[in-house]
Amino acid sequence: MTHPARVVQIAANEVGYTEYPPGSNSTKYGEWYGMNHVPWCAIFVSYCLEQAGICLAIRTPKGFAYCPDGVRWFQYNTRWHSQPQVGDVVFYSWRGDGIADHVGIVESVNPDSSIISIEGNTAIDNDSNGGEVMRRRRDPWSFLGFGRPYIIAESVPTPPISQPQKEPEKQPEKAPTNSQQQPNQGTQTTPEYHTRLVNQLLGKEKVN
């Protein structure tokens, strides 16, 4: 199972969980994080990621409890996207002012660009502090952006195997032509032959 599918499955298993007592912000997620009795939508997301084996030390070794901290981390680490994918961390800005008010996990993307997300600390009448884990349908106007906590490995092309270079074949040496050959006078070298020939022509040496 891929990391995105694993995160979605873990979040889905939490649907229906409610804080107790109501209105207290007291949850098992807050106890796990070490910060209970506080708004817990971001803590819920951190919990689901950690349970899937993804520990993002955004604010603490366990993740983040404050939505803007998550936004800054994803943006700084170039994992911030404008279009959703399943398993993304979705940040909402209800007023459209660029400030994250709430966070959840994308479960599915609809053809009309809306999403189904699983969110902690929400309710039908209170989007950001409702005290329950729920599935919510959200429209694009509410999206601030999407953090992608998964590093997708890109295939690296295998370099071609270098073939050993063949040494150039040596060309056989051509035998000198008759015109290139010098007359052989015994064991005389070429300069000696020329010298004797000149002397013979000048009458300084008898011809054998």
Predicted regions and their residues:
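Intrinsically disordered/low-complexity terminal segments and short unstructured peptides
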Residues: 1, 26, 59, 77, ...
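N-terminal capping segments
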Residues: 1-57, 159-164, 199-208
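Secondary-structure junction/capping motif
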Residues: 2, 26-27, 56-70, 139, ...
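...with weaker cross-activation on analogous glycine-rich loops/strands in unrelated enzymes
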Residues: 8, 54-127
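Residue-level marker of positions within ordered structural domains that often coincide
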Residues: 16, 50, 95, 122, ...
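Residues in intrinsically disordered, low-complexity segments of regulatory proteins
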Residues: 31, 39, 72, 79, ...
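Aromatic- and glycine-rich peptidoglycan recognition patches
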Residues: 100-208
